[in-house]
Amino acid sequence: MKLVNPHYFDVIELSDENPETLVIENPHVFKDVLQALILQSEVDVGEFVLSESETKVLSLSKYTMVLTDIFNYDTYSKQLKTKLTNIIVSNYSEIDGKEKVIGDINELGVKIMNSLPYSVSFKSAISFTDVVKFLDFSFDFSEYEFWDRFIEYISTAFELLNFKLLVTINLKDYVDHEEYVELMKFFQNKKIPLLMIERHQHEELDDISHLTIIEIGRAHV
């Protein structure tokens, strides 16, 4: 894959074999790039071009996972929750006890309706989807240690939401060399293309053959 933004940087070659790093030394440009990237990852409007081939351009909002804060896992929680609900509805629609639960809910509704001193109605056509939504299933990564939680969250998101590229912001500021090596092994084993956007270089971690630098003298657009 390739990523380019004509305002800020030339083509960055992306693969699942070697993570790429984009260092933006100018704080104003750094802010501008992040704002533009986040906006395009949400509404697909902007100057970033992600392509799988010369003729196939990919939607950033559909295929790019942008993690601006590795301490916050809310960004894609709604999408993951919706996907989880759909999986449960599709795979457990014939589960034992389903009809009894739905019947009991309807019976409870009738009892309440008949006991009220008002003329009311209720949703009697309860579906299995309604029951699953009521149970409010969601992914819970709280039992994991910090980096294990990070890995599990990304792995789950890529599996269920079909992302093709992960973009992290200042990831290298939070890892030592050993942690970094283990994280890169994970991304390579999972075949997840990774672009790390950083505010400054990390000599002990950077691979100069996979490093793009927007120098501090660059004016922001």
Tell where the protein language model's regions lie, with residue ranges.
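Short acidic, S/G/P-rich loop/turn micro-motifs used as interaction or catalytic elements
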Residues: 27-30, 138-144, 170-176, 202-203
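Conserved P-loop NTPase mechanochemical-coupling segment
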Residues: 105-145
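Conserved Walker B catalytic segment
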Residues: 173-191
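Sensor-1/coupling segment of RecA-like P-loop NTPase cores
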Residues: 187, 191-208
